[in-house]
């Protein structure tokens, strides 16, 4: 496990890690520090951090769970009831059907407006999911990850410990729900419309997106380079030529 770039302790190499077009890792990391310093913005991982964390999940079941959270923005409860039947991987545009736990608990077919379709835009993930299902051959209507929240957290803690033992450290505390926040931020970094992300993430209230977009307000303010410091001597010379106010 010596081929992974340490994410926090190699500043000379972090610019090599891709985030999104026109965005480097060092800048994105700095923005995250600012945005999360008050606690108003949820903690999230950047794409290279997620890639590294998944690298330290050798168990394919663990790996595919967190890869699914990362690729879809699912809530933990939603992922717990996902079945092979939820996925459509063969079409030109693969996707997954996402139901809330409350909807799944009801009998009968759920209303169409309570089924969320999330496109799977990363072909590598789609191929991994196909390969995993072929290998494990799960029943089509059997949940893929019917485990407790505590079990999911333990799987994640094991990966974090493996990473730290290999010299890879994360500057935020990572939980399963962190992957949902990370998905939303990753989509924003790739300039997807807020309303589209809101729909894909299953947020009913548009205001729920504001906690994420404030990161980009910080970025915009930083790039404006608005000067506030002037030459006091020159200013005094100019003001001296003006008539006094009556």
Curated annotation (Swiss-Prot):
The answer to whether UniProt assigns keyword Transcription regulation to this entry is: yes
State the family named in the UniProt similarity comment for this chain: Belongs to the 'phage' integrase family.
Q: Which GO terms describe its biological process?
A: DNA integration; DNA recombination
The organism's place on the tree of life at top rank: Bacteria
Which Pfam families does the UniProt entry name for this protein? Answer: Phage_integrase (PF00589)
* Name of the featured protein: Probable site-specific recombinase in afa region
Q: Which residues form the Tyr recombinase domain?
A: 40-225
* SUPFAM superfamilies assigned to the protein according to its UniProt record, in alphabetical order: DNA breaking-rejoining enzymes
Give the transmembrane ranges.
none
Species, as recorded: Escherichia coli
List the Gene Ontology MF annotations in alphabetical order: DNA binding
Q: Which residues form the active site?
A: 75, 102, 177, 180, 203, 212 (o-(3'-phospho-dna)-tyrosine intermediate)
Q: Keywords for this entry?
A: DNA integration, DNA recombination, Plasmid, Repressor, Transcription, Transcription regulation
């Amino acid at each position: 496990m010596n081929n992974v770039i340490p994410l926090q302790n190699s500043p000379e190499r972090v610019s090599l890690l891709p985030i999104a077009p026109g965005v480097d890792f060092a800048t994105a990391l700095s923005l995250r520090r600012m945005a999360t310093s008050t606690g108003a913005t949820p903690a999230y991982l950047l794409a290279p951090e997620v890639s590294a964390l998944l690298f330290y999940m050798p168990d394919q079941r663990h790996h595919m769970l967190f890869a699914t959270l990362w690729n879809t923005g699912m809530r933990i409860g939603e992922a717990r009831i996902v079945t092979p039947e939820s996925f459509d991987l063969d079409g030109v545009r693969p996707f997954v059907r996402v139901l809330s736990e409350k909807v799944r608990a009801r009998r009968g077919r759920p209303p169409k407006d309570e089924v969320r379709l999330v496109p799977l835009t990363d072909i590598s993930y789609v191929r991994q999911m196909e390969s995993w299902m072929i290998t494990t051959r799960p029943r089509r209507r059997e949940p893929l990850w019917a485990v407790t929240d505590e079990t999911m957290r333990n799987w994640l803690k094991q990966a974090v410990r493996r990473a730290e033992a290999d010299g890879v450290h994360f500057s935020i505390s990572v939980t399963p729900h962190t992957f949902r926040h990370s998905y939303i931020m990753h989509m924003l970094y790739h300039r997807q419309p807020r309303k589209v992300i809101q729909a894909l993430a299953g947020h009913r209230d548009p205001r729920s997106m504001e906690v994420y977009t404030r990161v980009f307000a910080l970025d915009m303010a930083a790039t404006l380079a608005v000067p506030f410091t002037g030459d006091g001597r020159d200013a005094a010379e100019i003001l001296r030529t003006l008539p006094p106010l009556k």
